[in-house]
């Protein structure tokens, strides 16, 4: 099984990826671990693309990948995915979760972050959560994915829907 998890920052993509990876015994790739170098420096695109392509090739039998990053093997990830899960929670819920995550991981690097990228929350990230990361264009992109892959597409808009989805596994 191949599962792509997309959605807004703070919606729980990495947590869900870890759970599904454990549930199905699949390797998990958190896109943030590839996109960033230590200190939240963006990795050169060619390197990032090579790492993702290698992961997909080496795990042809199944995987869980969380993260959007539409320039990095995006079409391939969606084409190959048996399930495309989109987490699109309210902005305030996502902000609350991001703040809680920061409080729990302050000064540490999360498993779903790149080495050397300590958990942080700053004005730029808050703006991303509340506005820039959830524009009408980004939502339209998620809707187009649902139209293109209706049999594989799962939209989850709140915690209750997420819990219902998890119970059905």
Tell what function each PLM region has.
Residues 2:
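Walker A (P-loop) ATP-phosphate-binding motif of ABC ATPase nucleotide-binding domains
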Residues 13:
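Conserved lysine of the Walker
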Residues 50-95:
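Glycine-rich phosphate-binding loop used to anchor ATP phosphates in small-molecule kinases
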Residues 9:
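The conserved Walker
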Residues 89-137:
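A glycine- and Lys/Arg-enriched "phosphate-lid" helix/loop adjacent to the NTP-binding pocket
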Residues 18-62:
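Conserved substrate/cofactor phosphate-moiety recognition/catalytic segment
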Residues 23, 127-169:
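NTP-dependent small-molecule kinase module
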Residues 5:
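Hydrophobic anchor at the beta1->P-loop junction of P-loop NTPases
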């Amino acid at each position: 099984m191949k599962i792509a998890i997309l959605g807004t920052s703070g919606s729980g993509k990495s947590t869900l990826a870890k759970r599904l990876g454990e549930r199905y015994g699949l390797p998990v790739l958190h896109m943030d671990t590839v996109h960033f170098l230590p200190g939240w420096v963006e990795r050169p695109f060619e390197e990032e693309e090579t790492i993702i392509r290698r992961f997909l090739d080496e795990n042809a039998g199944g995987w869980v990948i969380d993260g959007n990053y539409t320039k990095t093997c995006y079409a391939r990830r969606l084409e190959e995915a048996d399930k495309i899960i989109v987490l699109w929670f309210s902005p305030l819920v996502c902000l609350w979760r991001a703040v809680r995550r920061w409080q729990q991981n302050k000064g540490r690097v999360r498993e779903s972050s790149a080495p050397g990228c300590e958990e942080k929350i700053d004005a730029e990230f808050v703006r991303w959560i509340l506005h820039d990361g959830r524009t009408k264009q980004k939502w339209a992109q998620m809707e187009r994915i649902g139209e293109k892959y209706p049999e594989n597409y799962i939209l989850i808009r709140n915690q209750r829907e997420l819990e219902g989805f998890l119970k059905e596994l």
